[in-house]
Amino acid sequence: MGRGFLRVRYRAAMPADPVHRPGATGIDPDRSKWWVRRLVPLLRARRTIFAVTMACGLVGLLVQVSVPMVLRRAIDVALDQPSGGLYGYVWVLLGMAVAAFGLRFTYRYLLFMTAYRIETDLRSLIYHHLTRLPFSFYDRVASGDVISRANSDIRSIQLLLAFGPLWALAATSFVMAFGLMLSIHVPLALATVAGMPLVYVLAQRMRDHVFPLSWVTQGRMAEVAMVVDENISGTRIVKSFAAEADQIAVLSRAAGRLRWSATALVDARARFNPAIEAIPRLGMAVVLLYGGWLAIDGQVGVGTLLAFSTYVIMISVPFRMLGFVLLQYQRAAASSMRIFEILDEDPVIR
């Protein structure tokens, strides 16, 4: 009688389930959709601040991409007119630097703030859903596994939400910078990016290796968390049966399996990341060699050569970030599937 009364009171006190309820901030209920599309309702709830964030990032990118062109013009004017004409460009470059700093600071601040807020929304969503699941769910799923999904898995998604847009903006800068390079000198621009298709091939191979290892690593992190949580919760039982040595052995085996998968993941990154980051830097050697020869021959000016050097540094940024973002994408994909396994459980308390 008392237990039934408490159950009725508990159900009455709980708010309606927000996970799949229409109009609520939750995940998409269609399990056949791509994992990113299932998270769209959470992203849509922050669409205003996200739009402001991307607007600041794009405007700051336009300013940044325009700097080498202004610098090119300033150097050419200074070489043609040594007596003057340079001070105006100095003030323009100073103003562009201040504007780029302010816009990029605002963009990064708002982006990370939005990512953390979405992480908070997802944590709250999982917490409210866990309070509505039947006891049979906790009989099937270990407590350490639940803790891992509610912490490290959500953290993986938050990191992708923070660094994914950063990489997208860097990729946009590559497109814009390459377009400006083509407008200056087509053969030199094509020679500079000749090695980029190889970077794409390496990135695809890295993705194929990283995803299964990320999935296994996340699961084994949950296994270690489960062993630790069970021993903390059942300390008295372990001591009563003098099972300390047995539990230490269980933890050692779980940690060994985690070490193997984590080491394999690092090894996969180490085989591909150096090449992915180094190949774009060969473009600088092409600019110095081929571009220097063109400058000596009088086909391009010194300002053009400096602008190309600046653009080469700019277009190498997305490739330096590519390995990290690919790893975070694979980890977030694996983590989202583990989180959806909880959120897709039918609650008994409505």
At which residue positions do the language-model features occur?
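An intracellular "coupling" helix at the cytosolic face of ABC transporter transmembrane type-1 domains
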Residues: 44-48, 135-136, 152-161, 209-226, ...
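Transmembrane helices of ABC transporter permease
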Residues: 45, 49-62, 166-217, 289-300
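Helix-loop-helix
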Residues: 81-85, 180-194, 268-337, 342-343
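Membrane-proximal cytosolic tails and large cytosolic loops of membrane proteins
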Residues: 1-32
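Alpha-helical segments in transporter systems
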Residues: 37-40, 48-69, 73, 89, ...
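Juxtamembrane helix-loop junctions of ABC transporter transmembrane domains
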Residues: 21-32, 55, 63-79, 96-143, ...
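A short amphipathic helical element positioned immediately N-terminal to and/or at the very start
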Residues: 30-50, 145-146, 150
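Transmembrane helix-loop-helix hairpins at lipid-water interfaces of multipass membrane proteins
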Residues: 3-6, 10, 50-103, 182-187, ...
